């Protein structure tokens, strides 16, 4: 097994939550440290606080992957007598690197908002606000029948074959005869130089977002047995890869608002929420934006949702919600902590595929600043 460095782990993060999905001005990525350093232990956290850094030091963590960037606002100087300054000093002293995936993880398929929607058992989910589009591509690879599985895995393990949020590893296979004549300088896996060879082959096809072209073609070339594999990639005119903020979906059946709030508190492991609207209403269609969704209340209303879930609802926004008749549950910003276990599982899965040796843990520090008295 290989001890990978920080760059190799951030490459995995790029597959999970591509940087280009981030909202404009969001300071994602490296926060502090050295990504070239070998990584033997990774810790996932919602927030980077001094208590979290102390935990990382105690547990000998090399890389912290956070949801919220702690260098969110421009820093003109670092005063090591302040709480943040002390934290940065500790990170540098103990050679701990910090990396953040924020709105890109909120927006990505399978990211924060999908996790929250899944915990509520929402069905037929779609995005609330489209924020990114690009073309889909299709790849067609011609491979000997006995090598089909290795090439198929190279495709699906690198992002090809996903259709929507509920279908993965979608490929299409057709059989035929492949013919080729190796030149004098060739090193053919099958056949002889200067001799026409014809063998049964399988054409395997899958779609993928355009941004994954280089990653997928590189992986296929590594997995393919041929010296010069036949690979076709073309842009699809009829399909577009879309990503967006928030999710809206439906519950299996209509329930009362009070019952839904109880269900939500259990799903998100919280004791209290704030509510705006009519508690006597019924709920089936639900819109949710993890974190601060104040700017998107009209988009949430336009979905036809019976209730909107978000965090950090402002006083005047609450009046606006009453005015547009959109019942809203303020479940707090801290519900985004669900990303810790999700990223741990995804990283373990990818590290196993890549044969990386490391330990993955989630922070046990409660970073919610609020108490209810």
Curated annotation (Swiss-Prot):
It comes from the Bacteria. The lineage of its organism: Bacteria, Bacillati, Bacillota, Bacilli, Bacillales. It holds the Pfam family DUF34_NIF3. The keyword Metal-binding applies. Belongs to the GTP cyclohydrolase I type 2/NIF3 family. This is GTP cyclohydrolase 1 type 2 homolog. GO terms for cellular component: cytoplasm. Keywords: Metal-binding.
């Amino acid at each position: 097994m290989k001890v990978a460095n920080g760059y190799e782990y951030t490459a995995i993060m790029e597959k999970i939550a591509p940087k280009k999905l981030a909202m404009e001005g969001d300071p994602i990525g490296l926060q502090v440290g050295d990504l070239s350093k070998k990584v033997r232990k990774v810790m996932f956290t919602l927030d980077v606080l001094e208590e979290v850094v102390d935990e990382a030091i105690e547990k000998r963590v090399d890389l912290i992957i956070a949801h919220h960037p702690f260098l969110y606002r421009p820093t003109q100087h670092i005063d090591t007598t302040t709480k943040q300054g002390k934290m940065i000093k500790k990170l540098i002293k103990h050679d701990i690197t910090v990396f953040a995936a924020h709105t890109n993880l909120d927006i990505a398929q399978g990211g924060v908002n999908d996790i929250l929607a899944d915990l509520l058992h929402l069905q037929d989910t779609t995005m609330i606000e489209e924020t990114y589009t690009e073309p889909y591509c299709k790849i067609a690879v011609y491979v000997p029948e006995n090598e089909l599985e290795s090439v198929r895995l190279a495709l699906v393990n690198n992002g090809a074959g996903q259709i929507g949020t509920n279908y993965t590893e979608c490929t299409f296979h057709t059989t035929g005869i492949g013919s080729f004549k190796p030149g004098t300088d060739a090193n053919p896996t099958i056949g002889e130089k200067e001799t026409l060879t014809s063998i049964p082959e399988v054409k395997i096809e899958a779609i993928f977002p355009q941004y994954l072209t280089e990653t997928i073609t590189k992986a296929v070339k590594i997995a393919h047995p041929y010296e010069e594999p036949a690979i076709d990639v073309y842009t699809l005119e009829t399909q577009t890869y879309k990503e967006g903020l928030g999710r809206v979906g439906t519950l299996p059946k209509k329930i009362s608002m009070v019952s839904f709030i109880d269900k939500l508190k259990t799903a998100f492991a919280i004791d209290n929420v704030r509510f705006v609207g009519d508690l006597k209403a019924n709920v089936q269609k639900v819109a949710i934006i993890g974190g601060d969704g104040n700017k998107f209340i009209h988009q949430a209303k336009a979905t036809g949702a019976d209730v909107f879930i978000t965090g950090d609802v402002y006083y005047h926004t609450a009046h606006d919600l009453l005015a547009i008749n959109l019942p809203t549950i303020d479940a707090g910003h801290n519900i985004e902590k669900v990303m810790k276990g999700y990223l741990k599982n995804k990283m373990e899965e990818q590290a196993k595929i890549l044969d990386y040796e490391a330990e993955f843990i989630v922070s046990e520090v409660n970073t919610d600043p609020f108490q209810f008295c």
